Amino acid sequence: MIRELTLHGGMPALAYGEGPPLVFIRTILPNAGNPTGMSRLTETRQLNRLTRGRTIYSIGRRPGRKAGTTMADLAADVAEAILRKFREPVEVMGFSTGGSIALQVAADRPDAVTKLVACATAYRLGPVGKQVQRDYRDRLARGEYRGAISALVPGWVDKPLPQKLLKQFMSLDTSTPEDPDGMIAMLDAEDGCDVDCEKIAAPTLLIAGDRDRFHPRDLVEQTAHRIPDATLKLYPGRGHVNVVRDKSFYPDIIRFLVNR
């Protein structure tokens, strides 16, 4: 059974499963509220695979965030929501931009995090990731919503022909985001992200693909080296998006959460 709830500051959340809490921080989505339709179905399928003996609270961004927001701002929102809801530190997980926020929460507010799982992320963006996210951000800021998401394709695909075909397909997207200001806020925050990893006290699992163009291998390895208690799982041949399809992805997370 999935429960909808609202955390401190109006932060939307969905709760999956029963047991001790794990907070999952969502990546950049077009709406500030909980996902609906296919996005919700995808989230449900993914998180249900991790609900063994725990409740996963999937949380979105706080409504009202604007351009110029920093990663520290987003991390403070999450930490405050955690401590007001649970009155104690909890397990925290994030993917992509959500993973960047999770790293920042663990660095800034060690009192809010017991264990950390950060997937498809690093302490900062690589050059390709920074460029494509700036392009995406600028399109949103200009109100050029049609096909705006195609700006991210060079971060997903490295070969020219597949990149060209996917760009053409994504350019057909005619949807209008419900909360473009919030998307811009998250993109601004990650653009300036530079996590002080040495301050992360929680045991940390980093998962990444060795072909991730947003957060390339060297940055991921630097992140793992700088976190005092980090375990790195680097999946060969996986990129930013398809890292979740690796057969080891969910088992590695479950083992880390259960055994550490």
Residue ranges with predicted function:
Residues 5-65:
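Conserved HGGG/HGGXW glycine-rich cap/lid loop of the alpha/beta-hydrolase fold
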